[in-house]
Design a protein with these regions (language model features):
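Membrane helical hairpin/interfacial module
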Residues: 51-126
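Structural signature of hydrophobic alpha-helical transmembrane segments
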Residues: 56-69, 119-132, 187-200, 263-272, ...
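Cytoplasm-facing juxtamembrane segments at the starts of transmembrane helices
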Residues: 17-34, 85-93, 142-164, 192, ...
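Membrane-interface helix-loop-helix junctions at boundaries between adjacent transmembrane segments
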Residues: 84-91, 108-164, 169-193, 214-218
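N-terminal signal-anchor module of multipass membrane proteins
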Residues: 2-73, 78
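The first (N-terminal) embedded transmembrane alpha-helix
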Residues: 24-45, 95-106, 155-173, 228-241, ...
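C-terminal transmembrane-bundle signature of multipass membrane proteins
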Residues: 37, 42-43, 67-71, 75, ...
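Generic multipass alpha-helical transmembrane bundles of integral membrane proteins
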Residues: 160-280
Length: 373
């Protein structure tokens, strides 16, 4: 009888491995946004002194991050062609910057809990990945982009800015641990902040041109649209981190009024986008009646909500505007339900996909059997 069970279990195991392998082959390159969304909510709750909830999200990331990095590594080895196809696609290549941002967000989580060595290692990995991806992605855009107009532009491109500014956020913290390199790291953080702002100005100009002066369809209004707001929010948060870093470099200290003013502008710009993005969502799902469904890109909507909460709360500390602190504290209760809803949708979607695959396997295994009834 045990032999019969083993014989029945072997095909099931092979089928499961085949499904897993297929999912790895088709893995969405922006899936690390799950770690980004989970981590930023954890950090927001930590700053708001809700340490128990924050720790729960931290534990989730401690499990999710190595799983996702392992999945990406396996995809690189087993499905190299599929990975390269995504890397060489101008519409997808910038999604790989979620690896940078996810690593930095986890690094901040570690640093808040006193794991300095882990945060340093994660920052070094994130910076190296960012450096390679930045020049590679612009090479793809320059030499492999066959689109002759702005239709190739979408909100996902701005994940490159999110990755850049996340290096600032963790880099400022790493500077406190690497005393010998502290000044250099703070200077580098200011440089990265400036690069992120320059890239944001370029991309958001192209994106706004595409959005406001071309015909929009419901398919154009994906959750990645929210990265436009998220990139502004993380730029404001990075500026706040520079202001609060207390760097004793005369030249950089003299730049504080400029950093303060630009931080206010990008925070206001990100705030301006929120009602418009909600309106776009209503138009797509209510007016055009496109049903809500789960896709991994939804995590790129959750992350900006959490980042806006953190950016607003921390900017209130730097600017000494108490009402912004209240707004930041309350906005986290928009982000947390969004995370919970997306997580539930992800679980249900994956279970349905697994059930569908099992049903397909069963039908293939019994080709001569007719359906009953």
């Amino acid at each position: 009888m045990s032999d019969r069970k083993d014989g029945a279990g072997a095909p099931a195991a092979r089928a499961f491995l085949a499904i897993l392998d297929r999912n790895l082959r088709d893995l969405y390159p922006g899936y690390p946004a799950f770690v980004m969304a989970t981590g930023i909510i954890s950090n927001a709750l930590y700053f708001l002194e809700m340490f128990g909830l924050s720790q729960l999200f931290f534990v989730i990331n401690l499990v999710a991050y190595p799983i996702l990095m392992t999945a990406i590594a396996i995809r690189l080895v087993r499905h190299t062609a599929a990975l390269w196809a995504d890397l060489l696609n101008p519409r997808l290549v910038f999604s790989f910057f979620t690896i940078v941002a996810a690593t930095d967000v986890l690094g901040i989580q570690c640093d808040l809990r006193g794991y300095a060595n882990a945060s340093i290692a994660l920052w070094l990995f994130a910076f190296t990945t960012w450096f390679v991806l930045l020049y590679f992605s612009f090479a793809v855009l320059s030499f492999l982009n066959t689109a002759l107009d702005a239709n190739v532009v979408h909100g996902g491109w701005l994940i490159a800015i999110v990755g850049t500014q996340s290096l600032v956020l963790l880099g400022v913290r790493v500077a406190d641990h690497w005393i010998a390199y502290s000044t250099g790291l703070i200077v580098l953080a200011h440089m990265l902040w400036g690069i992120g702002l320059a890239l944001y100005a370029i991309f958001v100009t192209l994106f706004s041109y595409r959005t406001f002066f071309f015909k929009l369809t419901p398919d154009d209004l994906s959750p990645l649209l929210w990265v436009v707001m998220g990139a502004a929010a993380i730029s404001a948060n990075a500026g706040t981190s520079l202001l609060l870093s207390g760097a004793h470099v005369p030249y950089l200290t003299s730049m504080n009024p400029f950093v303060d003013g630009v931080t206010l502008i990008v925070w206001a710009w990100g705030t301006w986008w929120i009602p418009l993005l909600v309106f776009f969502g209503v138009w797509k799902h209510v007016v055009c009646r496109v049903p809500l469904s789960y896709s991994p890109a939804l995590w790129s909507l959750v992350f900006p909500l959490g980042m806006y909460s953190v950016a607003t709360f921390r900017f209130s500390l730097a600017s000494q505007f108490p009402f912004l602190g209240y707004l930041g504290r309350e906005f986290i209760w928009v982000a947390v339900p969004a995370w919970l809803a997306t997580a539930c949708a992800m679980i249900v979607s994956n279970l349905r996909g697994l059930k569908k695959s099992n049903m397909s396997r069963d039908c293939q295994g019994r080709p001569g059997q007719l359906p009953s009834g």
